[in-house]
Amino acid sequence: MATLTETISKADKHDEKLTDFQYSKKIFNGVHEVEDDKQRTDFTTVRFGDVEKKFAVPKDYKYKNVLPTFPNAVYNLTGELAFEDKGLLADPKFSNLLKDVTKVEHLARDLGTVLYGIQLSKLNDAQKNELARYIAERGVVYFPDQEQTLEEFQELGQYYGHSHKHGSNSRPFEDKFAEFQVVYSDRFSPYDQHAKNNSLRYWHSDVSFEKQPSAQTFFKALTVPEQGGDTLFISGYAAYEALSTPLKKYLEGLTVVHSGKEQSEYHRRSGQHVRLDGDTNAHPIVRTHPVTGWKSLFISPGFTRYIPGIPRGESDAILDYLYQHIANLSQSTVRIKWTSNGVAAWDNRIVIHRATYDHLPQTRHLVRIAAQGEVPFFDANSHERSEDLRE
């Protein structure tokens, strides 16, 4: 078991009143530049094995054991994993899940809900099953003020199936939390200029390039900025339904190639250890959800590359159109404003998401756990969500 050692920097007293925004000088050539460390007291240097790194957190930071690292582990591709969707066991009226809810706040008509009064660590199996179905219908659900340890958060994610381990993104150093993906940034973090200049590229469904992309996904906020750092979600159900009938029919016969190679190479160029290279797989453009039976547009701009079987120019034109199409679905887009100890649960198969990249140099720290879902499929007998809602 690795141990953590830390030292705290000492600063000159006359510089102690610098704010984070004063400390952040400028953004230049994609790098978020910072002043000399001697001006600051509010950071800790943490050692993970032979690697030492600065973090803009206090010396007694509660979540030091889940700060981001790239340990020298090696992951291997596995065969197809069994997946039984817990939503298939759920009461479709959500009689167990909603009985203790004190307030239901829908963020949009068909996407996004905030549930108040529930503690995720107290859910029984019937409630967990209904949560799987609830996010299969609502896309993303937010739970504020969760009194939940990291171990309890991990147990919740593990309930839904084999927990995904990311091959290249940061994870905790300790193997006990190897299933967590760590999302962390602060004033020491590189700033990707593409986040401002090429926003469509940042919409994505997590690990859509894998043979079995993530299904039920849980994201826990540990430290949140005062402003910014929100997450936006778009409904794949709504994206499909907003297409013209001829285009729907055309797309239902096509697949699209998703690739994680570029993500792996980005980490490698950044000097970070890659545990498993991103895979490449073709998935249906129109996907059927196994619980709801609803059709969803399964496009992930961060990872989709081309449509096989048609000319590349035609493929590029179709994908460019679909990217613009989903980005313009303002009525089917919601924003999650993170609060400390809040948890978001979403169905990664039927929403895409992106961060807003507007919080730096403030610290943003979250951890994610997700179940690996089924191999994506299209069922010609599936139907649109709106058909059920009209009944």
UniProtKB/Swiss-Prot annotation:
Cofactors that this protein relies on: Fe(2+)
GO biological process: alkanesulfonate catabolic process
A single GO cellular-component term on record: cytoplasm
EC number: 1.14.11.-
Positions bound to Fe cation: H204, D206, H353
Binding annotation for 2-oxoglutarate: T231, W338, R364, R368
Domain of life from the UniProt record: Eukaryota
Pathway linked to the protein: Organosulfur degradation; alkanesulfonate degradation
Molecular function as annotated in GO: 2-oxoglutarate-dependent dioxygenase activity; metal ion binding; sulfonate dioxygenase activity
SUPFAM superfamilies: Clavaminate synthase-like (SSF51197)
Co-factor: note: Binds 1 Fe(2+) ion per subunit.
Keywords: Dioxygenase, Iron, Metal-binding, Oxidoreductase
Task of the protein: Acts as an alpha-ketoglutarate-dependent dioxygenase active on sulfonates.
The family this protein is said to belong to: Belongs to the TfdA dioxygenase family.
Entries under PANTHER family matching the protein: ALPHA-KETOGLUTARATE-DEPENDENT SULFONATE DIOXYGENASE (PTHR30468), ALPHA-KETOGLUTARATE-DEPENDENT SULFONATE DIOXYGENASE-RELATED (PTHR30468:SF31)
Name assigned to this protein: Putative alpha-ketoglutarate-dependent sulfonate dioxygenase
